[in-house]
Each structure stands twice: as structure tokens, then as C-alpha cells.
């Protein structure tokens, strides 16, 4: 059964320049930037410090079938909310076509990235408000934030492709994030359309802070499960010198 939403936004273009404009408004400094990743197979072409990955992919029948099967067994992978010991900050998506926004929020709210946020910035304040809340309350707080909606709307109309005529128009692409807990080394797949954060284990024992090669292998496996579809694209949130 497809998710139901309470409101709708114009979709965000998968463009690093657009993403970087938005994260600047949210409170990220210039030292945090998104950039395109064109290959996962050549380490020489990958950034040194990957704080998060955002994967954009088509919502094909193959993906929908796999999602349904995994959701049926959610008790095997879902991380329960624990206010006292939260290893991954996850937001339930309640805004249609805003998966790009949720991917950005997940990338910035987890791992080392959250330590870069400007104190008192839009996202820093939202994270302070939502941290003690359960997922349903946190989702409603994001949905009700006029400041967040205004920042997003000012950027979503930009990009190289024309925005849909209506925010309610459905799009066939979805965004998810992969982040690392610096405390435990666990890799999390964060998708606002799922029942909770997906714990993908500790792939990088030797690199427990940022995403290392074995974390990238998990993303490769996700892409491979899409079969012959070539509609995937990938962006990395990186720390610049």
C-alpha cells in the first residue's frame, strides 16, 4: 500500500549545486558540500572524506517488490527509537515529493555532519526540538515548520529541469541516504518512506567514522539489486579543506 501524505512539495532536482544552496540555508558551512559520484569502482576518483551518500533511483516494480518484502520483515532490521541512546536520527516522510529534502536532513543530522551545523541555524534548531520526540512527533514538527518549507521552496524551483506544474504531480524517482554512526561504526540506510532506519551493520572496522570502501560495497549491492536499470545517480556529502 503506497504511503499517504499530509502535504506536498515541488520535487528537488538531483543537482549538487541545488543541494548545496539548500544546505547552506539550513545551516551547513561552506566546508560541507555535496558533489556527484560517477563511479564507486575507482577509489582514486572518490573523495577522501565522505560523511554521507544520497542515492537517487527510479521506483521500479522491482524496487517496490523488494521494499514490500523487506517491510514485512521489519522486525529483523528496524532500529527502535531510543531517546537516551539514538544511534541514527531518522524522520518519517509525511510530505509528498520531498524525499530529496528528507535525504538531505538525514545526511546532515547524522554522523560528523551534524557537528558542522552553525549554532542557532534553521536545522540546528529543528534538531534540538525534534531530538527528544518520537518519530511521529518529529515528523509533524518538520511538516509544521514554515521556515523549513520557505527555505526548501526557494531552492526547489531552481535547477536545470523545469519544476512540475503542481506539487501533487507524482515523480518516479526516490532519494535515500546512507550515513555512518561515529560512535558505533554502524552504517544506516535512511529512507523516510520506510518504517524506520535500516541498520546495515559495521562494514568498515578500520574506518568507523566516515564511509569507507566496505560501506560503499553496501551501496553497490543496493544498486545491483536494481537489475539492468541505469537510472541510478549518487551524490556524496563531503568535507572540504
Language model regions located:
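Cysteine-dependent deubiquitinase/ubiquitin-like isopeptidase catalytic cores across multiple families
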Residues: 1-241
Amino acid at each position: 500500500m503506497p504511503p499517504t501524505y499530509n502535504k506536498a512539495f515541488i520535487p528537488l532536482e538531483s543537482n549538487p549545486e541545488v543541494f548545496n544552496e539548500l544546505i547552506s540555508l539550513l545551516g551547513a558551512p561552506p566546508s560541507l558540500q555535496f558533489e556527484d559520484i560517477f563511479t564507486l569502482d575507482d577509489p582514486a576518483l572518490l573523495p577522501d572524506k565522505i560523511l554521507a551518500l544520497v542515492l537517487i533511483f527510479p521506483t521500479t516494480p522491482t524496487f517496490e517488490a523488494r521494499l514490500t518484502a523487506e517491510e514485512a520483515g521489519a522486525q529483523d532490521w528496524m532500529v527502535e527509537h531510543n531517546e537516551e541512546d539514538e544511534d541514527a536520527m531518522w524522520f518519517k516522510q509525511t510530505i509528498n515529493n520531498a524525499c530529496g529534502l528528507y535525504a538531505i536532513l538525514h545526511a546532515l543530522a547524522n554522523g560528523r555532519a551534524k557537528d558542522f551545523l552553525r549554532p542557532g541555524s534553521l536545522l540546528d534548531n529543528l534538531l534540538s526540538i525534534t531530538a527528544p520526540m518520537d518519530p511521529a512527533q518529529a515528523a509533524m514538527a518538520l511538516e509544521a515548520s514554515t521556515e523549513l518549507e520557505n527555505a526548501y521552496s526557494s531552492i526547489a524551483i531552481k535547477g536545470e529541469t523545469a519544476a512540475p506544474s503542481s506539487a501533487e504531480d507524482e515523480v518516479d524517482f526516490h532519494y535515500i541516504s546512507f550515513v555512518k554512526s561515529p560512535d558505533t561504526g554502524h552504517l544506516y540506510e535512511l529512507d523516510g518512506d520506510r518504517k524506520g532506519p535500516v541498520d546495515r551493520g559495521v562494514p568498515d572496522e578500520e574506518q568507523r567514522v566516515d564511509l569507507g570502501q566496505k560501506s560503499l560495497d553496501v551501496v553497490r549491492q543496493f544498486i545491483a539489486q536494481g537489475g539492468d536499470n541505469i537510472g541510478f545517480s549518487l551524490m556524496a556529502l563531503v568535507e572540504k579543506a
